Every structure is written in structure tokens, then in C-alpha cells.
């Protein structure tokens, strides 16, 4: 059965609706984020906004307080969805290393054997805005990362313009969702300010109606106090995050670049086009389409053959030929040794029986070519070095010459 891309995806992402929505592996944190947004708004509508409906006349303008809170919350949730449920800019991984960047090297072992090997350069230089930038090779995705791209260890993907991995949205923040992430954080900041302000207004109204002190008014509406405390604490996080990313956008940096290259001034100015253009690039440029079609069917890739360079291939063929020749010399020497031992044994038996041996009678011419010296240590070797002693080669040649002379 043919499978789709999302079914065999090698990253750690989670897909729903047949690969139409993509989340990070920690998407289970999303319900907590939803509760932190929805619960305070519900409490605000029930215990604060409901009592302010008739406080602003004419035209019952107090109803607008509740409507604004609800619409603002829906807007924040939509931004959260766009941030966490879409491709952040994942670079498609390769099934094999890029052939145009392969380097073929030959290593020589201790016994003289040459072994060809394939190497991948760890880095290479590219030019960005007239500045040389070093990009790294990713062993997991088997590709050279584009500039400003980094590999997320949580999602196990290379992400373009990688900013960071946010556990609150359960997704990487990259090229295709950074705009929505910033809008989500900044809108959450405004929502906190709105709820805090309206809760404070409600306490002020209670003070005016009852001619009471602030402490008595707070006692009359404890939920308003709880909402003010909650929003004050949340503002330190989302408000600080909004301010930090405003600075990053103005200088066209990412969180990853700011933390890693904080001491490199040249790195920070490579992509800086000026504050107005930097904001236009983030908020007004068209969002690039995804480079992955997660619902596409997988096509079987034909077998891949790596062709070694001619020099490597010729050296390998020469090595095989030398090995064959050495093996032949060793085999010839072993056969000659066995024949000599057989001849000695037969002559000894004939001498004991006082009978001439006709089939293995050795004439004087042939006797000179048979070796009677001690057995060399290189004879009979089956493993180890392929080197053959020079004396063995000379004796083999002399034996072959004598044999040809008799023929």
C-alpha cells in the first residue's frame, strides 16, 4: 500500500487530519496554554464585565467591554493556531548526501593496501549581502543548512530562519510562523493590559458607589483582584517577550543568533537592512509556501550507484591485478613443494625395497632444478601480508625456465 509523506516522516512532529496540520512533539502543552488564556477571560466576563454593562450610558456602551474581551480572545486563539499548527519552515531532508559535494580520498594501510573513502566537508562558504557566511553540514538531514537555518533537536528538523522552539505553543518558531508568533505574544500582552485595566475600573466604580475605601471595594469583588494579580504576573512574561522581539525585529536578528553570536558584531549586521525595512520584511512580506507536501504519495527511488573517480578506480584495478599475480606465485610454489616431497618419499620407498622407481625417476637435468634447501618461511602462508620474498620469485622463475628447456 502506497504511503504518504507524513506517514513516514523522520522528524518528531505529530500530524492530524491526514497531514493537513503539523505540530511539534510537545503539542500536549497546548491545552495548558489554552486554559491560561480562556479561564481568565471567562472569569472576567462573569465577575467583572457583566457588572459593567449598564455603567456606561448612553447606548449601553458597557456591553462593548464584554464584546471586546471575547473578540480579542478569539483573535489570540486564531494566532495561536497559526503559530503551532503549520509548517514553521522545515527544510526537506535528503535521502543521501549531495553528490556534488562529495570528496573521494584514498587511505593507505600499514600493509600497503589502498582503501577509497568518501568524505563530506563539514562547512562551506556562501555569500550573503556581500559578506561571506559559513554554513554547516547536517548529518541528520544530509544537507548543507541554508543561511540562518538550524537543526531543532526537539523536532529533529532543520528549520529556516530558526528563532527558537517554544514549548508553550508546541512548535518551532521559524521563517513561516514567526510573524504569527510575535502577533500572538503581543496580542496576549494587550489582552492582559485590557483585563487588568477593566478590573481596576470596576474597583474604582465600587469605591464611588459605596463611598468605600479601596480595601473595602477589593473585598466586595475578590475576583477582580485575582484577575489583576494574574495579569500583572503574566505581563512580566509576555510583555517582556514582546519587548525583546521588538528589538530583534528592529535589528533583523533571531533569538538563536542573538544568544549564540552575541560577541560577533559582523554576524549581526549581515541581515540588518535598517529598522523600517526590517519591520517590513517581517510583517509585510509574503509568507513563503511550504517546501514540504506532507500529503503527497511516496515514490520509490531507483537504486543509486556512486561512481568513483577514474584515478581511484584504476588504483583499485591495479591492486586487484597485483593480488592475483601474488596468489598465483604462491600457488605455484606450493605445488612445486608438494611434488618435491612426493618424489623424496617415493625414492625412499624404492631404496628400502631395492627396486627402481620408473614413474618418478629423476634425470640429472631435472634434479638440478628441484630445490633441496630448507623450506622458506614465506611458503604455505595463507593470510597476513601479500608480500612475497624476492628469493621466492627468482626461484620460481628459474624453475619455470628449466621446465621450458626440457619441453
Swiss-Prot record:
DHHC domain spans which residues? 136-186
User: Topology relative to the membrane, per the entry?
Assistant: Multi-pass membrane protein
Here the segments flagged for biased composition (Basic and acidic residues) are 358-368
Family per similarity comment? Belongs to the DHHC palmitoyltransferase family.
Name the gene behind this protein. PAT08
Q: Which Pfam families match?
A: DHHC
Keywords for this protein: Acyltransferase, Cell membrane, Lipoprotein, Membrane, Palmitate, Phosphoprotein, Transferase, Transmembrane, Transmembrane helix
Q: Which InterPro entries match?
A: Palmitoyltrfase_DHHC (IPR001594), PFA4/ZDH16/20/ERF2-like (IPR039859)
This protein's GO cellular component annotations are: plasma membrane
What PROSITE patterns does UniProt report for this protein, alphabetically? Answer: DHHC
* Enzyme Commission designation: 2.3.1.225
TM helices/strands, residue ranges: 29-49, 62-82, 181-201, 224-244
Q: Where, subcellularly, is it found?
A: Cell membrane
**Species of origin:** Arabidopsis thaliana (Mouse-ear cress)
What this protein catalyses is:
L-cysteinyl-[protein] + hexadecanoyl-CoA = S-hexadecanoyl-L-cysteinyl-[protein] + CoA
Task: Let me know which tissues express this protein, per UniProt.
Answer: Expressed in flowers and pollen.
Q: Where is the active site?
A: 166
List, in alphabetical order, the Gene Ontology terms for molecular function in this entry.
protein-cysteine S-palmitoyltransferase activity
Q: What does this protein do?
A: S-acyltransferase involved in protein lipid modification.
Which residues are annotated as modified residue Phosphoserine in the UniProt record?
Answer: 385
Domain description: The DHHC domain is required for palmitoyltransferase activity.
Q: What is its main location?
A: membrane
Q: What is this protein called?
A: Protein S-acyltransferase 8
- UniProt region (Disordered), positions on chain: 348-368
Amino acid at each position: 500500500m502506497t504511503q504518504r509523506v507524513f506517514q513516514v516522516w523522520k522528524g518528531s512532529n505529530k500530524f492530524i487530519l491526514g497531514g493537513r496540520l503539523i505540530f511539534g512533539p510537545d503539542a500536549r502543552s497546548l491545552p495548558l496554554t489554552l486554559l491560561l488564556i480562556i479561564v481568565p477571560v471567562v472569569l472576567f466576563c462573569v465577575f467583572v464585565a457583566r457588572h459593567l454593562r449598564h455603567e456606561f450610558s448612553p447606548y449601553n456602551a458597557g456591553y462593548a467591554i464584554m464584546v471586546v474581551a471575547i473578540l480579542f480572545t478569539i483573535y489570540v486563539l486564531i494566532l495561536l493556531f497559526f503559530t503551532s499548527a503549520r509548517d514553521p519552515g522545515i527544510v526537506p531532508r535528503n535521502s543521501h548526501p549531495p553528490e556534488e559535494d562529495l570528496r573521494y580520498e584514498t587511505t593507505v594501510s600499514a600493509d600497503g593496501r589502498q582503501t577509497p573513502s568518501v568524505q563530506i566537508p563539514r562547512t562551506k562558504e556562501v555569500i550573503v549581502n556581500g559578506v561571506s557566511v559559513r554554513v554547516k553540514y547536517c548529518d541528520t538531514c544530509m544537507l548543507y543548512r541554508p543561511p540562518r537555518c538550524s537543526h531543532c533537536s526537539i523536532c529533529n528538523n532543520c528549520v529556516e530562519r530558526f528563532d527558537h522552539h517554544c514549548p508553550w505553543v508546541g512548535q518551532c518558531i521559524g521563517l513561516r510562523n514567526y510573524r504569527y508568533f510575535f502577533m500572538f505574544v503581543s496580542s496576549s500582552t494587550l489582552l492582559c493590559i485590557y483585563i487588568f485595566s477593566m478590573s481596576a475600573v470596576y474597583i474604582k466604580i465600587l469605591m464611588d458607589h459605596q463611598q468605600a475605601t479601596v480595601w473595602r471595594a477589593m473585598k466586595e469583588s475578590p475576583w477582580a483582584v485575582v484577575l489583576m494579580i494574574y495579569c500583572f504576573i503574566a505581563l512580566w512574561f509576555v510583555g517582556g517577550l514582546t519587548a525583546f522581539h521588538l528589538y530583534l525585529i528592529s535589528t533583523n536578528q533571531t533569538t538563536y543568533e542573538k544568544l549564540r553570536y552575541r560577541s560577533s558584531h559582523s554576524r549581526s549586521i549581515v541581515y540588518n537592512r535598517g529598522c523600517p525595512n526590517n519591520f517590513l520584511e517581517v510583517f509585510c512580506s509574503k509568507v513563503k509556501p511550504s517546501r514540504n507536501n506532507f500529503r503527497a504519495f511516496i515514490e520509490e527511488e531507483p537504486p543509486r550507484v556512486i561512481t568513483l573517480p577514474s584515478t581511484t578506480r584504476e588504483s583499485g584495478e591495479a591492486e586487484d591485478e597485483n593480488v592475483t599475480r601474488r596468489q598465483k606465485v604462491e600457488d605455484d610454489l606450493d605445488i612445486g613443494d608438494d611434488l618435491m616431497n612426493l618424489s623424496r618419499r617415493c625414492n625412499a620407498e624404492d631404496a628400502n625395497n631395492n627396486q627402481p622407481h620408473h614413474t618418478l625417476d629423476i634425470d640429472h637435468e631435472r634434479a638440478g632444478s628441484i630445490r633441496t634447501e630448507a623450506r622458506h618461511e614465506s611458503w604455505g602462508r595463507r593470510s597476513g601480508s601479500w608480500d612475497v620474498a624476492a628469493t621466492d620469485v627468482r626461484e620460481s622463475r628459474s624453475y619455470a625456465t628449466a621446465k621450458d628447456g626440457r619441453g
